[in-house]
Swiss-Prot record:
Reported induction: Is under the dual control of the transcriptional repressors LutR and SinR, which allows the lutABC operon to be induced during both growth in liquid culture and biofilm formation. Is induced by L-lactate, which relieves LutR repression.
Disruption phenotype: Cells lacking this gene are unable to grow on minimal medium with L-lactate as the sole carbon source. Cells lacking the lutABC operon exhibit little or no defect in biofilm formation on MSgg medium, but form small colonies that almost completely lacked surface architecture when glycerol is replaced with L-lactate in the MSgg medium.
Residues the entry annotates as binding [4Fe-4S] cluster 1: 313, 316, 319, 373
Protein name, per record: Lactate utilization protein B
Underlying gene: lutB
Binding site for [4Fe-4S] cluster 2: 323, 366, 369
Record function comment: Is essential for L-lactate degradation and allows cells to grow with lactate as the sole carbon source. Has probably a role as an electron transporter during oxidation of L-lactate. May also allow cells to utilize an alternative carbon source during biofilm formation, since it contributes to the formation of architecturally complex communities when lactate is present.
Molecular function as annotated in GO: 4 iron, 4 sulfur cluster binding; L-lactate dehydrogenase activity; metal ion binding
Keywords: 4Fe-4S, Electron transport, Iron, Iron-sulfur, Metal-binding, Repeat, Transport
Cystine pairings recorded for this chain: none
GO biological process, one term: lactate catabolic process
Family affiliation: Belongs to the LutB/YkgF family.
InterPro entries: 4Fe4S_Fe-S-bd, 4Fe4S_Fe_S_CS, FTHF_cligase-like_sf, Helical_ferredxn, LUD_dom, LutB, LutB/LldF, LutB_C
Annotated 4Fe-4S ferredoxin-type domain residues: 304-334, 353-382
Length: 479
């Protein structure tokens, strides 16, 4: 699965999301639960704003010294017997991983949850080579067996499905014969996945944070699949975005606490795993061979720009969980594996404005996302910068918008035109007016007035009322 999901136009995706009542209900309920848990976890920690500032400082420091820490990480991974590959593009990353698997004659692959492997379209590349690739995160596994349904949330990828829908998928794909009880569904999936773990030749994981001074990679999970993926297969491949790095375990401790509290409202997740190279002589667990693939794929182009702060992201989805737009349209409406406010900022940077020029406008600019972000990314400000670039640098504003703004500028800068427009506006809008409201607006007002009240122009203008009042006052004074 590549970063881009679906081929429908943005407006069509949004309409589909709005029409999906179950999805909107599920998203709204999940947002409320996760928001409440996050606030409780933040209050329990205490001094939340100070923790946010510290986390921001750590991420900013890493980005400003990224060359050094990437070099240190690569050196320490190599010292411990691992292999490091820097991939400039998604194609380079996928090709390297494919070559490693072919050299090991690997055919059965298990994966833990990883957004960057979806970004580089890894599963499709490996499946074309005849490999069996199994997602072992339960949410991702559900989506995979359901015809590779795209994720709709960074942390909870199957958020858009209910237990009845999951039961039906299991019945059709896994010969499931039980009820929709979550416990029964999980036990059935667990039995299948356990066998896959034991049969796998290759394990592929993502990386929440790489620790530069030890050459370690970390996995933060609640299901334990990350440990099985990284210890049972003989060859482990970890794939990470180049910015997902911390100097030492001291900084890791801070960020992982912020990640778990912001993502799911937990002090810590059930499993926090740090892996350092292949197993040593005499060790029982762990891979015999370890590869770390560090992916650029457009990230270096963001460094040093006005958008650099977006690379501070720790993928907690706190911004998604408070976003009113996401609540109404869902994750698939964004057309990217990165949804919500972070996706609206990041997707155009990694995928370009051709595919994602609408996303910066999918925001009310309420700044709830910026307030929720544990590393203080000013997301609403970055969305505005995107809009500015789209109009001024890219020249991609719709023709209708350009004409409307030009007409407004012309009318607002000419007193005679402004007077004429305000005088004739009530008459011009009469066919669209009902009960002093525009009920069926023309042009761009049509969608607005279908679900909102838009006041009709008043028949008497303020300037006329004010002039009449002044005349009346002068008359009284003269009398």
């Amino acid at each position: 699965m590549a970063m881009k999901i679906g081929t429908d136009a943005f407006k069509e995706r949004v309409s589909q999301g709005i029409d999906n009542e179950f999805m909107r209900g599920a998203v709204s309920g999940a947002q409320e639960r996760l928001r409440t848990r996050r606030l409780e976890a933040a209050e329990e920690l205490g001094n939340w704003e100070e923790w946010r500032s510290l986390s921001e400082e750590i991420r900013q420091h890493v980005l400003e010294n990224l060359d050094f820490y990437l070099g240190q990480l690569a050196e320490n991974v190599a010292k411990r017997g691992g292999h490091v590959y820097f991939a400039k593009t998604a194609e380079e990353a996928s090709s390297y991983i494919r070559d490693v698997i072919q050299k090991k004659n690997g055919k059965k692959i298990v994966k833990s949850k990883s957004m960057v492997t979806e970004e580089i379209n890894l599963n499709e590349v490996l499946e074309k080579e005849g490999c069996e690739v199994v997602e072992t995160d339960l949410g991702e596994y559900i989506l995979q067996i359901d015809d590779h349904d795209p994720p709709s949330h960074i942390v909870a990828p199957a958020l858009h499905k209910n237990k009845e829908q999951i039961r039906d998928v299991f019945k059709e794909r896994l010969d499931y014969q039980h009820t929709e009880k979550p416990e029964e569904l999980v036990m059935h999936a667990r039995a299948i996945l356990r066998k896959k773990f034991l049969e796998a030749d290759i394990g592929i994981t993502g990386c929440n944070f790489a620790i530069a001074d030890t050459g370690s990679v970390s996995l933060v999970t609640n299901e334990g699949n990350g440990r099985l993926v990284s210890t049972l297969p003989k060859t482990q491949i970890t794939v990470m975005g180049m910015e997902r790095i911390v100097p030492s375990f001291s900084e890791f401790e801070v960020l992982v606490s912020m990640l778990t509290r912001s993502a799911v409202g937990q002090r810590l997740t059930s499993y926090i795993t740090a892996l350092t190279g292949p197993k040593l002589e005499g060790e029982v667990d762990g891979p015999e061979e370890f590869h770390l693939v560090i992916v650029d794929n457009g990230r270096s182009n963001i460094l040093g720009t006005e958008f650099q702060s977006v690379l501070q992201c720790i993928r907690c989805a706190a911004c998604i969980n408070v976003c009113p737009v996401y609540r109404h349209v869902g994750g698939h409406s964004y057309g990217s594996i990165y949804s919500g406010p972070i996706g609206a900022v990041l997707s155009p940077l990694l995928g370009g404005y051709d595919d994602y020029k609408e996303l910066p406008y999918a925001s009310s600019l309420c700044a709830a996302c910026s307030e929720a972000c544990p590393v203080k990314i000013p997301l609403h400000e970055l969305l505005l910068k995107h809009r500015q670039n789209i109009v001024e640098k890219e020249g991609r504003a719709p023709i209708s918008e350009k004409l409307a703004m030009k007409a407004f500028g012309l009318g607002a800068s000419s007193l005679s035109l402004y007077k004429m427009g305000s005088k004739w506006a009530p008459a011009a809008m009469t066919p669209f007016t009902e009960d002093e409201k525009i009920s069926k607006g023309p042009g761009p007002l049509k969608n607005w007035t279908q679900i909102r009240d838009f006041p009709a122009p008043h028949k008497s203008r303020f300037r006329d009322w004010f002039a009449d009042r002044e005349t009346s006052e002068r008359t009284k004074e003269e009398q």
